[in-house]
Amino acid sequence: MRIFCDDLLLPEGPVVLDDGTLLVTELGLDRGCITLIAADGATRRLIAKTGRPNGLAVDREGTIWVAESLEPSVLRLGLDGESVVHALACEGELLLWPNDICVGPDGAIYVTDSGVSVTDFLDGDWPRADYASLHLDGRVCRYDLGGGESRFLDRGLQFANGIAFGPDEVLYVNETMTGNIYRYESVAGGRRELFGNVLDPDHDSRDLRGPDGMKFDAEGRLYVTVFGQGDVTVLDGCGRVIDRIATQGKAPTNLAFGPAGSRTIYVVEDERGHVEVYGTPADGLPLHR
């Protein structure tokens, strides 16, 4: 393990660009920005302040897609910092907490909405004491860039969070409150089935813990950051836990695979505010763009 960079305020949404630079979001209310970090981790620059940006994705045109959670929306952003609101709603319903985001194999944008507003769930930057009593209607949204249509692929999740497409090109979404990872029957959603669960039965903390951002490697393993549990849990292609990579802090929020050939993951962690790099047996599954 090595520290790639530090002094980040609640980092999330890492994306490694083709030149090896790293995009991250900083959720802390004092920053609320998207930051670009040099490939060696030594320098960084502010791209844009959007409020409380959460997840990021980059499409084939180089457009940065942002799940913005403070003023709930899906944004389009350039490296010059110019942003455009793409969506405030899905199927006419206002977004509550756009959390994570990815590009699908069909070129559409897929977004998890955690199903509760940031202001209702958080006390400052951290979950409020009675978070478990809140009503949650986590949703999965799809935005068709060609026709401009939006629709819900699923709803009723207990804090929809991480989202990814697997080597089978179907959709996977996790649910923070239960620890569950779900697999859908097709790229367009459809029937939901339990793929696996990342909660460690030997972990005795009563604080919030559950899956956050996740990515697949090229050999079909799924790497899931587990907020509050302090690890990246690795599942095999059948959904079985095969490894737990302990992180330096207890609040990892997301990860990205390093450049091709590096066999590394970049893990962003909130408690200590840094990016940690770990070796892996394979490169990441190439992301759809």
Residue ranges: model-predicted function:
Residues 37-42, 78-82, 144-148, 185-189, ...:
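Short loop/turn segments that connect beta-strands within beta-propeller blades
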Residues 175, 179-180, 192, 196-240:
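Loop/turn-rich, solvent-exposed surfaces of beta-rich toroidal or solenoidal domains
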Residues 44-48, 84-88, 151-155, 191-199, ...:
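Beta-propeller fold detector
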Residues 1-8, 288-289:
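A short helix->beta-strand "capping" segment at the edge of beta-propeller domains
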Residues 6-21, 49-68, 73, 90-109, ...:
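Beta-rich, blade/repeat-based domains predominating
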Residues 27-29, 69, 114-116, 176, ...:
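Short loop/turn segments immediately following the C-termini of beta-strands
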